Design a protein with these regions (language model features):
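Membrane-interface alpha-helices at helix entry/exit sites of multi-pass transporters
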Residues: 55-59, 96-113, 290-303, 334
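Membrane-embedded alpha-helical modules
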Residues: 108-224, 340-352
Length: 352
């Protein structure tokens, strides 16, 4: 408890707090730009923190991490274009809320529930580090294979009534993921003699292309007088709509948010997972247990609440395995491990 108190007060020293704010601002810029991510931001800016003290440098990097995950939801909500995998599930309901003129409400919900999820993840990191880390350590190849099958089965759940389309989209995604060099045999797959295809296709490139370009083409196709009137009506509704969820809506989201925050923190502690898996699982399970599942995917308040909470609660879980076992929970913590080593710290049990 004494060490925890000392750490808490050290955060609010002038220099550490300043660098934390600096990292948050940098993360906001990085998180809202399609094609960038928290991983790329930390990897690019880490060399600029070498002249800082370890506490100051980690304040910058952790500020970027948390802020970029939150800011990723802004593009997902406003233009239906997730800039990182973690914000994919926020497009399910967030963009529909914007289409209904609830822009302020959607953005404020993203902020509120992201903070709630981040705090829940922090509690897990502080209180449950060792139990969660021991659980994650038990995950071997059979468990990872089972989780992969579970992830594939989620395609049917999130596709609604269009099961065939969901299966087809999943098959195309698996096909694209096999492009490049086979990591086991070294043989080339679907490169068609193009050496630039050896490294495969980056997930972010596919994601921005599928969501971003598709949304641009969709908006171009809607250019008509009738659609202009609808957009004007949506703008008027946006000016008059409530900026925050109603008390009844907030009360109804407490239990789903609490459950999904806890689940996401545990998922984040499992190596190889991330905010995208946690958010989609939480969205689907909340829909399954909802009294009004037909509202999900059409601007449901709980749909946006649990996804915003989930992709931020994952951070605490991912940091748990990184700090206690030295095993990165996701791509961002893999880069953070390298940063800690450069500061002279070795993540793992010896840190405790």
């Amino acid at each position: 408890m004494e060490l925890l108190t000392q750490t808490f007060w050290s955060i609010f020293t002038t220099d550490v707090f300043f660098y934390c704010i600096l990292g948050v601002v940098a993360g906001m810029v990085i998180g809202t730009l399609p094609g960038l991510s928290a991983t790329m931001g930390i990897a690019i800016l880490t060399p600029l923190t070498f002249w800082l003290e370890p506490a100051q440098g980690m304040a910058v990097l952790l500020g970027i991490y948390n802020s970029a995950i939150w800011a990723g939801g802004i593009s997902a909500i406003l233009i239906n274009t997730p800039v990182s995998p973690a914000s994919i599930a926020q497009t399910f309901d967030g963009y529909y809320m914007v289409s209904q003129g609830k822009v302020k409400k959607a953005l404020n919900m993203n902020t509120i529930y992201s903070v709630i999820g981040g705090l829940m993840g922090t509690v897990v990191l502080i209180v449950f580090s060792f139990p969660v880390a021991r659980f994650a350590l038990k995950f071997g190849p059979p468990e990872m294979f089972a989780m992969a099958l579970f992830g594939l089965s989620m395609m049917i759940g999130v596709s609604g009534g269009y099961i065939l389309k969901g299966l087809l989209a999943g098959a195309l995604g698996l096909m694209v993921s096999t492009i490049g060099m086979d990591p086991m045999t070294g043989s080339l797959r679907f490169t068609f003699g193009n050496m630039n295809m050896m490294d495969g296709i980056e997930f972010v490139v596919v994601m921005v292309g599928m969501f971003g370009v598709g949304e641009v083409l969709f908006q171009i196709s809607k250019r008509s007088e009738e659609d202009k009137k609808k957009r004007q009506q949506a703008q008027i509704a946006s000016n008059t709509a409530e900026a925050f969820p109603a008390a009844k809506e907030f009360k109804g989201s407490v239990i789903p948010t609490a459950i999904c925050g806890a689940i996401s923190a545990v998922i984040g502690a499992v190596p190889g997972t991330g905010g995208d898996i946690a958010a989609i699982i939480c969205w689907q399970q909340t829909k399954n247990f909802s009294k009004h599942p037909e509202e999900f995917g059409k601007g449901a308040v709980n749909g946006l609440a649990v996804t915003s909470c989930a992709n931020n609660a994952v951070i605490g879980g991912a940091m748990t395995t990184m700090m206690t076992l030295g095993i990165p929970g996701d791509g961002v913590t893999a880069v953070l491990i390298g940063s800690l080593m450069m500061y002279g710290m070795q993540p793992g049990p010896m840190m405790f």
